[in-house]
Amino acid sequence: MDAPRIIIVGAGHAGCEAALAAARMGLRVWLYTLNVDTIGLMPCNPSIGGLGKGHLVKEIDALGGEMGRAADASCIQYKTLGTRKGPAVQGSRMQCDRLEYSLAMRDAVERESCLSVRQEMVDGLLVRRGRCVGVKERSGYEVGADAVILATGTFLDGVIHVGSVSYPAGRAGEFPAKHLAKQLRDLGLPAGRFKTGTPPRARGASVDFQAMEEDAGDAVIKPFSLRTREIRRPVRSCFRTYTSRRTHELVRHNLMKSPLYSGEIIGTPARYCPSLEDKIARFPERQRHPVVVEPEGLHTSEVYLKGLGNSLPADLQIELVRSVPGLEEAEIVRPAYAIEYDYVDPSCLRVTLETKQIKGLYLAGQVNGTSGYEEAAAQGLWAGINAAHAILGKEPFILDRSDSYMGVMVDDLVTRGVTEPYRMSTSRAEYRLLLREDNAADRLLSKGHDLGLIPEDVCHRHDERRREREELCSRLEAVRIRPCADVNHVVVSRGGSEITEALTGTRFLKRPEVSASDLVTLGLLPEGIDSDLARAIEIEVKYEGYIDRQRREVDRFRNLERIQLPDDFDFDIVPGLSRELRERLKAVRPASLGQASRVPGITPAALTAVMVSLKR
């Protein structure tokens, strides 16, 4: 293998995206993994996307990432979530075949000519004069590189807990990275401990699906990737059941057998993915909690018991699972477990995800205190692009909070740090009406093309689609709809009032009871129009006022973002700042006045003082 320019440690969702991005930009990359058979592994839930997370997948795809394509290639169920809410918060979710997803990602990795995979434990970093210049393998072999990206997931000093039993592991059946974790602490990177976990898996043949509610997903599967024309695959249903009174009694009577409550686990758990013990202890008034039985794939009967994540003893887990209706005879294939691991506080990172203390060292994924496949993949892509740009002498690749959910996430991480596992949600984005799933390509595809990660033909197809949308919107604005029986029948049948004067097609569509499908019925939009195109037109027209308002807010936001703060700006000379606020600003080292405004604790008066000092 040729010597690498970039080394990536870890071949999970972050590592794969980082490696693929850098290799596709023409740099020689080595991707380290403990086991080549676990490249792109889904170690927890067999799904991609969700509220907020689906937005990330679409953005990753628009920038040339691989996650959306791998999900499309392994999809066994599709759902649009949040359909009762507005378009800004709706998200796509795919149930995936766990094995096929991993194989699709491995195939993508192995097809890249500039990318080499190495099955080996990385025991340490080579750091010389404040710069990371390579890695040291467990064998003692040293490999030099211009940049190193750590995408180590839960492997840094990982410890698995099942009841009173605990043992070192990065994942079930895999060794942890103890030496690397110690070195990061010795290098002065601010480290902490988080806790996550995974539910039990059961043998599908032992589950009584007839006793559960079937969830068959949506009839039409919409691809995540612009590069997927259509998805024609076998589909599988999920099934819903609920915990019982017996389930709750078992947990309450055995709470101290959980390391989460006995004091053995010190790591902070994820707020939005609580264990069963947490749900029952924190919400005693709840009579039941949902349990979703999800298929693991087409080639196995194994099912994932979403909602039953716990760290109770293995023998107690059998009784616990069998207390749930439909699981009375269930055979556990893999018990649930909790895992503690080291993370690095991301406030020590630059916006590029390079560490401030050590040049050439980038961190991506769960090592930065995040939770979730999609969050990890987005960071991996971001770090891979920026490491490549640094080596090639190009400007950093930065998206801001008004560009993308990726920009929101990275800004949150590096500006505010984390005190619990960070999970993306639509509520984190101030400009979410502008950052919808359906316009991810409008926002980011040209950037992906400029990076060399999106082919010309993909851009051409999207440009044609955008021109068609603009032409149809212009046609609606030009057409006049006059009161008549056909029009008023549509309006009244939807619960609206008759129109009494001529309206443009645009004003007619703005009425809450009118949809794009009604315009097709009336001949105002072409019959057979693509449903996604019709939906995009409807959103643009109905939400025009709100969208314009958010665009004005973005203009004000960008005015502050344009005011850059030098790397060596002296916050000690700013009058009126408290000592605590000075320390926070010096720790974060905001790159702009806009970023400074989001540092926890900063007030409008403090921001004005910084601005005045900057002008001096």
Where do the protein language model's features map onto the residues?
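A glycine-rich dinucleotide-binding beta-alpha-beta segment and adjacent secondary-structure elements
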Residues: 304-370, 398-411, 530-584, 589
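Core beta-strand elements of the Rossmann-like FAD/NAD(P) dinucleotide-binding domain
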Residues: 138-147
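Beta1/beta-strand and adjacent pyrophosphate-binding region of the FAD-binding site
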Residues: 2-14
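Extended, charge-enriched "interface" segments that sit outside catalytic cores
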Residues: 428, 436, 445-602, 606, ...
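Conserved N-terminal/central alpha/beta ligand/cofactor-binding core
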Residues: 20-128, 139, 151-171, 175-180, ...
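An anion/pyrophosphate-binding glycine-rich loop and adjacent beta-alpha core
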Residues: 35, 182-318, 326, 415-488, ...
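Internal hydrophobic alpha-helix adjacent to the cofactor/substrate pocket in enzyme cavities
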Residues: 376-397
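Glycine-/small-residue-rich beta->alpha transition segments that form the dinucleotide
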Residues: 147, 152-156, 312, 325
